[in-house]
Amino acid sequence: FHWSLALTFLGSWITAEAGLEWASTHMFLGYMMLSLLLFRILWGFVGTRHAKFSSFLVSPRVFFSSLQYLFSRRSEDHIGHGPSGGWATVLIISVLLVQAISGLFISDDIFNDGPYHRSVSDGVASFMANMHHLNFNLILCLVALHLSAIGWFQFGKNQALTKAMLLGKKKGPAVLGIKSSQTLKA
């Protein structure tokens, strides 16, 4: 999921900058992103142990107390997302969802309209277009923060997050691992 979403975002950014001839590809990637996000939200409720929101969303008190570990070299290992990573995941999913949904209502005023552009007033379409463009800047800030956090955990805290993200495996007690799913075999 992660790499599909990252590549879809990168492709959307490139096609948005490349010009109108890439608008249909940009729209396709927007649909792809929306599909991935809806899948991830569903997977957050019915997926494997460490993918479920209930496994990594903590109370504000626990979140703020965990911040002391975030900026120290002392490590607090988590098999799945830690408290800050869990809430960052929800934030990133949310802003990408706003981006994908707002794109459904906008137009380039020349050739391409989102599928719901004509179903809303000009004021709503204008609001959605502004949101789509301003939200992109927020996404860039969150991507930079995400990459910085990965770098800090990788090099400052010596946690092999990059390897875990590439291979989908992280060292830890076997009891905390994901058991093979038998659901699809039925």
Task: Outline where the language-model segments fall.
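Membrane-embedded alpha-helical bundles that constitute the cytochrome b-like, heme-associated redox core
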Residues: 1-186
